[in-house]
Design a protein with these regions (language model features):
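Active-site/ligand-binding-proximal alpha/beta "capping" segment
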Residues: 178-233
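Short beta->alpha connector loops at strand-helix junctions that form conserved
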Residues: 66, 106, 132-133, 155, ...
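Amphipathic alpha-helical repeat scaffolds
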Residues: 44, 110-117, 140, 233-241
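Short pre-catalytic strand/loop immediately N-terminal to key active-site residues, enriched for Gly-Thr
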Residues: 38, 105-109, 227-234
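RNA substrate-binding interface of SAM-dependent RNA methyltransferases
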Residues: 3, 96-183
Length: 258
């Protein structure tokens, strides 16, 4: 039941939050409640302000309308930041994507990793992330906080079958890149074509890409360890791997425009 609506409460003098509103905000830490209400929670003045330009604010809690104890009750953080905002979730349209570089996530489950990836995409000018249903919820409080406001500029789309979507884009001429141990060293000049459009697929933290998604990869890439032939860590954190791949793609963009 929606009990918090935008009103004069959020302009000028703010009315003190009711117990029902405080309980409602606290309930939004659970995905089923966020989905039922179509909202999510952000914390911290900067994050709330950044998101305010792209998402509709439903409720705001701060020192003007809630006590320190009440802020702590609503917060999901160990150290509450004094400002909490509840925003409406955005309805995204996958068909609105133009020909550009896209990131796809195949079952990235850790909220911290997803938040890092969203923030990294924002840094490298990636505006769209297509996610499998098994990927963590982008409106999870941990994800929202990790993005540091990047959700206002990066759009996420959750799809029933990622392999089907990849196949559709491949038929439109999009190269599909995937990080695989049997891939081509991505630092080889020919590994990354000069096309501006494409989809970079990153896999699950423990299992990598699913078999179905792997079949759609047209350009398997390897992030090589150093030095070659010497035992190193088994794999990279998916957030770090995403940053390395995007940095190389953007470096190639720069070289190709010189």
């Amino acid at each position: 039941m929606q009990i918090c609506k935008k009103s004069s409460t959020f302009a000028g003098e703010m009315e003190h939050l009711s117990k029902a509103q405080i309980k409602w905000v606290r309930s939004l830490q659970q995905k089923k409640n966020r989905d039922a209400e179509g909202v999510f929670v952000a914390e911290g003045a900067k994050c709330v302000n950044d998101l305010g330009g792209s998402f509709e604010l439903v409720l705001q809690a701060n020192a003007d309308n809630a006590s320190v104890n009440e802020i702590e009750q609503m917060s999901s953080l160990r150290t509450p930041q004094g400002v909490i905002g509840v925003f409406k979730q955005r309805k995204e349209d996958l068909h609105s994507i133009n020909e550009e570089l896209i990131v796809a996530l195949d079952g990235v489950q850790d909220p911290g990793n997803l938040g890092t990836i969203i923030r990294t995409c924002d840094w490298f000018g990636i505006h769209h992330i297509v996610c499998s249903r098994e990927t963590a919820d982008c409106y999870n409080p941990k994800v929202v906080q990790a993005t540091m406001g990047a959700l206002s500029r990066v759009h996420l789309y959750y799809v029933e079958d990622l392999s089907v979507i990849l196949n559709q884009y491949k038929s439109k001429g999009y190269p599909i890149y995937g990080t695989l141990l049997e891939g081509t060293n991505m630092y080889n000049k020919a590994s990354i074509p000069t096309k501006k459009k494409g989809i970079i697929v990153m896999g699950n933290e423990g299992k990598g890409l699913t078999a179905e998604v792997r079949k759609e990869v047209s350009h398997p890439l390897l992030i090589p360890s150093y030095p070659a032939g010497v035992a190193t860590s088994e794999s990279l954190n998916v957030g770090i791997a995403t940053a390395i791949v995007l940095a190389e793609f953007r470096r190639n963009d720069t070289i190709n425009t010189l």
